[in-house]
Amino acid sequence: MGKTVVIKCGGSVLDELSPAFFASVNAMRKQGMEVVIVHGGGPEIGQMLKTLRVPSEFVNGLRKTTKDVLAVVEMVLSGKVNKQLASMLRQHGLPAVGVSGVDGGLLEAEPIDLAKLGYVGRVKTVRSQLLRTLLAAGYIPVISPLGIDQNGQTYNINADTAAGAVAAAIGASQLAFVTNVPGILRDGALVAEATAEMIERLIEDGVITGGMIPKVQAALSALSDALPEVMIVSGKTTFYQNGTWHGTTIRKEVGVYL
């Protein structure tokens, strides 16, 4: 079995994925890598909630998920976004299979705070055997970030943290967060490498702002001894070619690569 890469595609970038993105995934596969994709769908969920007039609110950056909101989240993530992304991958010659984190109990979840957040969960266990079976058969699993507990209750899971949990469970050699920019930018120039300390400073200095803040925080929290570096890359341009990654590499500390 070759190296396994987990790619997380945010909901806001899905409509902007370019042919270069799919070419990058193809390049990985040609190098013998296995690929797993975890996707979000925030903008689509927000639009559907508005269309259906289902009230919703955010608490500490997470969408409070009532039963009504959860029904829409499931419909959009698993019924629409997941299938669209799997279809796009197949159109580019990539053998994708769309699955929900609920399927086969792939993502076993537990509530973060039922009173404050409703059915928002965290990943308790990843049943990685399902992913290993799909990978061994040559498929690219495309996962919508829903989880299920032992009582059969479904939970809405943050896609960034779901991707980190999947990467840890399958022993991925790389985790890449796909955004609509080439990585962390300072004065328009790409920051090729960053550490936790540097990122803290870049946030304080207003270099890292808005939606990039939760991305880099998710990247930092995914770092471990088994996964010493994480990438932030663009879905609009080539991010992997001839064995080389293009984007910002995030590591825990400078000593790792000096």
Swiss-Prot record:
Q: State which pathway it belongs to.
A: Amino-acid biosynthesis; L-arginine biosynthesis; N(2)-acetyl-L-ornithine from L-glutamate: step 2/4
Q: What is its main location?
A: cytoplasm
Query: Which positions does UniProt annotate for substrate binding?
Result: 41-42, 63, 156
**Which Gene3D superfamilies does this entry report, sorted A to Z?**
Acetylglutamate kinase-like
Q: Which cell locations does it reside in?
A: Cytoplasm
Q: What is its EC number?
A: 2.7.2.8
What GO molecular-function term can you cite, just one? ATP binding
Query: SUPFAM superfamilies of this UniProt entry?
Result: Carbamate kinase-like
Q: Please give a single GO biological process term from the UniProt record.
A: arginine biosynthetic process via ornithine
Keywords assigned: Amino-acid biosynthesis, Arginine biosynthesis, ATP-binding, Cytoplasm, Kinase, Nucleotide-binding, Transferase
According to UniProt, residues marked as the site described as Transition state stabilizer are 8, 215
**Per its UniProt entry, which superkingdom is the organism in?**
Bacteria
Q: Name one GO cellular component term.
A: cytoplasm
Q: Name the reaction it catalyses.
A: N-acetyl-L-glutamate + ATP = N-acetyl-L-glutamyl 5-phosphate + ADP
Q: Does the keyword Iron apply?
A: no
Which InterPro entries does this one have? Answer: AceGlu_kinase-like_sf (IPR036393), AcgluKinase_fam (IPR004662), ArgB (IPR037528), Asp/Glu/Uridylate_kinase (IPR001048), Glu/AcGlu_kinase (IPR001057)
**Annotated function:** Catalyzes the ATP-dependent phosphorylation of N-acetyl-L-glutamate.
Which family does the record claim for this protein? Answer: Belongs to the acetylglutamate kinase family. ArgB subfamily.
What is its quaternary makeup? Homodimer.
Extract the NCBIfam families matched here: argB (TIGR00761)
What is the name of the protein in this document? Answer: Acetylglutamate kinase
What is the name of the gene encoding this protein? argB
